[in-house]
From Swiss-Prot:
Disulfide bonds: none annotated. GO terms for biological process: glutaminyl-tRNAGln biosynthesis via transamidation; translation. Heterotrimer of A, B and C subunits. SUPFAM superfamilies: GatB/YqeY motif, Glutamine synthetase/guanido kinase. Allows the formation of correctly charged Asn-tRNA(Asn) or Gln-tRNA(Gln) through the transamidation of misacylated Asp-tRNA(Asn) or Glu-tRNA(Gln) in organisms which lack either or both of asparaginyl-tRNA or glutaminyl-tRNA synthetases. The reaction takes place in the presence of glutamine and ATP through an activated phospho-Asp-tRNA(Asn) or phospho-Glu-tRNA(Gln). It catalyses: L-glutamyl-tRNA(Gln) + L-glutamine + ATP + H2O = L-glutaminyl-tRNA(Gln) + L-glutamate + ADP + phosphate + H(+); L-aspartyl-tRNA(Asn) + L-glutamine + ATP + H2O = L-asparaginyl-tRNA(Asn) + L-glutamate + ADP + phosphate + 2 H(+). One of its GO terms (molecular function) is ATP binding. This is Aspartyl/glutamyl-tRNA(Asn/Gln) amidotransferase subunit B. Keywords: ATP-binding, Ligase, Nucleotide-binding, Protein biosynthesis. It comes from Hahella chejuensis (strain KCTC 2396). Pfam families: GatB_N (PF02934), GatB_Yqey (PF02637). Belongs to the GatB/GatE family. GatB subfamily. Its EC number is 6.3.5.-. The gene is gatB.
Length: 480
């Protein structure tokens, strides 16, 4: 039997406000435990929440970015449950009246086609604290620094059909929230966490299967592995005659599998009711338009501009526009060197290779955009050749200085004088008379391969300083 996966994601995005959603406590990541929790966060008697307008503005920004409807009246509710890191015994969230209603988001599939995914809603809520297990023997510590940090929970319709589609959707969300500046999107720090709802059904069947929810997956790679593993687990279970249980599961990255955490709750288990301490949020058209006027250029708009303004291919523009930091880096470097294609090739090639090897984002690159631009300027004006440029980039990466300084110190200035290069070529041809005869006797197809030998020997004699293009031109004349 052929099976089909049905996947929906609930993504919790930590908003980049300076203070918490209902208190004035700071939201800085990495502070000492319980140093950023005030009386409101600790649920001390008599403390009342005060709405952070900046969180509302950020939610509206996101809604406008995905073409969603902004609810003119949204209501906060109490979601009641007990957990040690939830001091009040309830979480303030939004149930029936979220700030953002239905929107759309386009993702690109592996085959190059686009697919539109419906975003059901995006609602504001407060984050819980954090349980600490490592430093306590036989006990659990509670850190309430995170309690009350504003979250935007973004819920998709179950329209995703594979683990890879889910990751494409998540990456697109990540791109949007970071472009907007409403979140840093750092999944390693919990700024973006994903709950994955997964079920399977026979292909062609309209009814949904029994779903499981995989909680708090915190990387793109783990989302793909967790969903794919859960799809396979459910199919194996059904084909062996078993039944899928509606439950919450956790992904174990070390064992690369999911394990049962608890039976899945329903909304009525939380006894939602409107929070009497918070008035409904009223959002009028003037406010919405004021927020709309602050929207930055979004990923798809930037991609289109990169194609039209810089003449980049859709693929190159898509890669460079995938993150705001990378797009800004590209434009800053291009402004210096004046060659968009050259800049794109080096960012996506030599620089990306080093970033990936060191698990760094481009914003953490030891080589600045200005530094790369100045290096490529020397490559473009033939001060150095391609091989030397790679050596200079490596030295810059290792903190040895700026491009011009390294070029001078290492003596990498290219030889571009025709007579000097011709002398190198003459020496190579004189030392390889047999190969010259073989070349002249060969057909055009073989000559194309053999010319590389002479180029290589010339570069060797010139200690890599000869301009390869000039070497090729002079060799072609002398061997014709």
């Amino acid at each position: 039997m052929e099976w089909e996966a049905v996947i929906g994601l609930e993504v919790h995005v930590q908003l980049a406000t300076k203070s918490k959603i209902f208190s004035g406590a700071a939201t800085t990541f990495g502070a000492e435990p319980n140093t950023q929790a005030c009386a409101v966060d600790l649920a001390m008697p008599g403390m009342l929440p005060v709405m952070n307008e900046e969180a509302v503005r950020m939610a509206v920004m996101f809604g406008l970015a995905i073409g969603a409807e902004i609810n003119t009246r949204s209501v906060f509710d109490r979601k009641n449950y007990f957990y040690p890191d939830l001091p009040k015994g309830y979480q303030i969230s939004q149930l029936d009246h979220p700030t953002v209603k239905q929107g759309k988001l386009d993702i690109q599939l592996e085959n190059g086609e686009k697919k539109t995914i419906t975003v059901t809603r995006a609602h504001l809520e407060e984050d819980a604290g954090k349980s600490l297990h490592e430093d306590f023997h036989g006990m659990t510590g509670i850190d309430l620094n995170r309690a009350g940090t504003p979250l935007l929970e973004i819920v998709s319709e179950p329209e995703l059909r594979s683990a890879k589609e889910a990751v494409a959707y998540l990456r697109k969300l990540h791109s949007i929230v970071t472009y907007l500046g409403i979140s840093d999107g750092d999944m390693s720090q919990g700024s973006m966490r994903c709950d994955c709802n997964v079920s399977v059904r026979p292909k062609g069947q309209k009814e949904f299967g029994v779903r499981t929810e995989i909680k708090n997956v915190n990387s793109f790679r783990f989302v793909e592995k967790a969903i794919q593993g859960e799809i396979e687990r459910q199919i194996d279970l059904i084909e062996e005659g078993g039944k899928v249980t509606q439950e919450t599961r956790l992904y174990d990255a070390d064992k690369d599998n999911t394990r049962s955490m608890r039976s899945k709750e329903f909304a009525n288990d939380y006894r939602y009711f409107p929070d009497p301490d918070l008035l409904p949020i009223e959002i009028d058209d003037a406010y919405i338009e004021a927020v709309r006027s602050t929207l930055p250029e979004l990923p798809e708009q930037k991609l289109a501009r990169f194609c039209s303004e810089y003449g980049l291919s859709d693929y190159d523009a898509g890669v460079l526009a995938s993150s705001r930091a990378q797009a800004d880096y590209f434009e800053a470097a291009t402004k210096i060197v004046g060659d968009a294609k050259l800049t794109a090739n080096w960012i996506m090639g030599e620089l990306a290779k080093r970033l990936n090897q060191n698990s760094l984002d481009i914003s953490q690159s030891p080589v600045t955009a200005e530094g790369l631009g100045k290096l490529l300027l020397r490559l473009k004006d033939n001060t150095i050749n391609g091989k030397a440029a790679k050596d200079v980039l490596e030295a810059m990466w290792n903190g040895e200085g700026e491009a011009d300084e390294i070029i001078e110190k290492k003596g990498l200035i290219a030889v571009t004088d025709d007579s000097a290069i011709e002398a190198f070529v003459d020496e190579v041809l004189a030392n390889n008379a047999a190969q010259v005869e073989q070349y002249k006797a060969a057909d055009e197809a073989k000559r194309g391969k053999m010319i590389g030998f002479f180029v290589g020997q010339t570069m060797k004699i010139s200690k890599g300083k000869a301009n390869p293009q000039q070497v090729n031109e002079i060799l072609a004349k002398k061997l014709s």
